[in-house]
């Protein structure tokens, strides 16, 4: 009798296991969105926006942090048709894209701005299948924060940097206009003097290992001098993936946001991702 009862219990348990497995297998996966999602990330200084392509819910993707020009915001980037050309190309790679508030409109790559972006990056990574890798794109003033994030002492690792008409030399920005000087002094808490070399991303880059860089600049730019920013920084570019794109026209002109430049930008980050993936598989 005891054996019969044990046999019946075993049979029942097996049947329940099969039924449970079948029920689990019968549940279809949630459908992927057909268009990239936009996730709003709130901070006191203003919102940031994470763009997630559908593929980055199914497969692991890297994150590109985009830092905005002076006097602008993540909302301006989100609404900009020109910036959207670049973002759409990155989403197609596929890469997730964080349009960062950078701690305010005129933070000039300050330590406080970098700390806020570090927290935004961590929060953004919880919203998609993040592989842990991060890249940076800086527009004009945003070049300082993007470059600083890839240098020793940054609160998070960055595998490559793209600057479009980007500032790299904080001392150069501080010395070219009184309005910039006042904003930089406020952002960095300076007591009237110029920024110390250890606050200047270009000075730090000149002492650090070479970086994968994608630099877009114009000799006609009368806002961010090409020779004292992009040209000097080009000397710190890692051979191989790095690219220097010289264009004509004024600061942040329309040709910076052309499909051609967007394709070059996406290809740059795509190459870095392919290399990083290959290296990870070898470990």
Question: What spans do the regions from the language model cover?
Answer:
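Short amphipathic alpha-helix adjacent to the substrate-entry channel of hydrolases
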Residues: 77-97
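The feature captures the conserved acid-bearing segment of alpha/beta-hydrolase catalytic domains
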Residues: 174-231, 235
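Bacterial N-terminal signal peptides
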Residues: 7-19
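Short beta-strand element of the alpha/beta-hydrolase
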Residues: 60-70
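C-terminal catalytic histidine-bearing segment of alpha/beta-hydrolase fold enzymes
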Residues: 231-283
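Primarily recognizes the serine-hydrolase "nucleophile elbow" in alpha/beta-hydrolase
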Residues: 127, 132-180
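N-terminal cap/lid segment of alpha/beta-hydrolase-fold proteins
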Residues: 25-59
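Alpha/beta-hydrolase active-site loop
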Residues: 108-128
């Amino acid at each position: 009798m005891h054996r019969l009862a044990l046999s019946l219990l075993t049979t029942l348990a097996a049947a329940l296991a099969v039924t449970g497995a079948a029920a689990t297998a019968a549940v279809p996966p949630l459908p992927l969105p057909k268009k990239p999602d936009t996730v709003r990330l709130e901070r006191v200084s203003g919102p940031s926006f994470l763009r997630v392509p559908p593929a980055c819910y199914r497969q692991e993707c890297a994150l590109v942090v985009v830092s905005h020009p002076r006097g602008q915001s993540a909302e301006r980037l989100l609404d900009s048709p020109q910036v959207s050309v670049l973002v759409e190309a990155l989403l197609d790679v596929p890469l997730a894209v964080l349009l960062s508030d950078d701690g305010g409109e005129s933070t000039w790559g300050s330590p406080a701005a970098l700390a806020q972006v570090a927290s935004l990056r961590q929060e953004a990574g919880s919203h998609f299948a993040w592989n842990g890798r991060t890249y940076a794109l800086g527009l004009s003033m945003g070049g300082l924060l993007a470059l600083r994030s890839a240098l020793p002492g940054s609160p998070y690792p960055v595998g490559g940097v793209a600057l479009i008409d980007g500032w790299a030399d904080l001392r150069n920005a501080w010395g070219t206009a009184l309005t910039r000087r006042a904003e930089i002094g406020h952002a960095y808490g300076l007591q009237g003097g110029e920024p110390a070399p250890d606050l200047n991303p270009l000075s730090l880059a000149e002492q650090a290992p070479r970086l994968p860089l994608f630099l877009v600049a114009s000799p006609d730019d009368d806002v961010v001098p090409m020779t004292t920013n992009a040209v000097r920084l080009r000397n710190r570019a890692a051979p191989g993936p790095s690219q220097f794109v010289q264009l004509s026209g004024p600061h942040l002109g329309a040709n910076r946001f052309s499909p051609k430049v967007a394709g070059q930008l996406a290809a740059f980050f795509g190459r870095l991702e392919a290399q990083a993936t290959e290296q990870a598989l070898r470990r």
